[in-house]
């Protein structure tokens, strides 16, 4: 079976209008992607994350006329150069994903590896993932920054909190790197289920506890990590500081370069901050909890 796929490059202001146009033309699905094909981070409640350069992708049945779709888009002031139409064949998408997911190294020890292949470094710390359980695999710069930071820490025997855990990759990496216990929290039940499945695949289920934020017990940990977004991080500064033991370490990401100072300012009263780490347009802010 084949499909007509139509892609349009736009900005965040035009994405919602395009979605309505595509739905009016009978699209079977409409997806919004970062033009760089980066995955979605955890958004603020009730919001849809859009990027400065957004690609809107619509899927139609094969008998849909590409010329008709083009004509309607151009009537709505969409430049012809921004429209891409392609007939795609139905595929085994799981196998397609498998061909593109290769081992990735973070720091000196840590690897993210597909579970069906041989580890690149049998003596390394290998975190195994499968299709369907792998959102937050390390391909996004913020995840990569967090994984590299974890690899640089001395985690043996420590408690770790992964606040906004998503697929649990950061908590699981901490356990594989020697942490005694990790606590993950997320507002999304699917994220908690993915974390549970990924922990089981990596044989660290006994060391991982998962909670919705409102059900999280009063606790403190030597290491706290939060890869969410800048605005939630700013509002959560008192909470995350309370979760971090005096002298403990924190790492924060999901922060764009132009948001760095606002996030850092929210945490300076609680932490002695390290030099910021950068990857592409994203940053990681880390530090140690002050004793007061």
UniProtKB/Swiss-Prot annotation:
GO MF, one annotated term: protein-lysine N-methyltransferase activity
Protein's UniProt keywords contain RNA-binding: no
EC number(s) stated in the UniProt entry for this protein: 2.1.1.-
Catalytic activity as recorded in UniProt: L-lysyl-[protein] + 3 S-adenosyl-L-methionine = N(6),N(6),N(6)-trimethyl-L-lysyl-[protein] + 3 S-adenosyl-L-homocysteine + 3 H(+)
Keyword Cell membrane attached: no
GO CC annotation terms, alphabetical: cytosol
InterPro entries to which the protein is assigned, alphabetical: Ribosomal_L11_MeTrfase_PrmA, Ribosomal_PrmA_MeTrfase, SAM-dependent_MTases_sf
Binding site for S-adenosyl-L-methionine: 143, 164, 186, 227
Domain of life: Bacteria
This protein's UniProt keywords: Cytoplasm, Methyltransferase, S-adenosyl-L-methionine, Transferase
CDD domains for this protein: AdoMet_MTases
Localisation per UniProt entry: Cytoplasm
GO biological process: methylation
Role of this protein: Methylates ribosomal protein L11.
Family named by the database record: Belongs to the methyltransferase superfamily. PrmA family.
Protein name, entry field: Ribosomal protein L11 methyltransferase
Organism of this sequence: Hahella chejuensis (strain KCTC 2396)
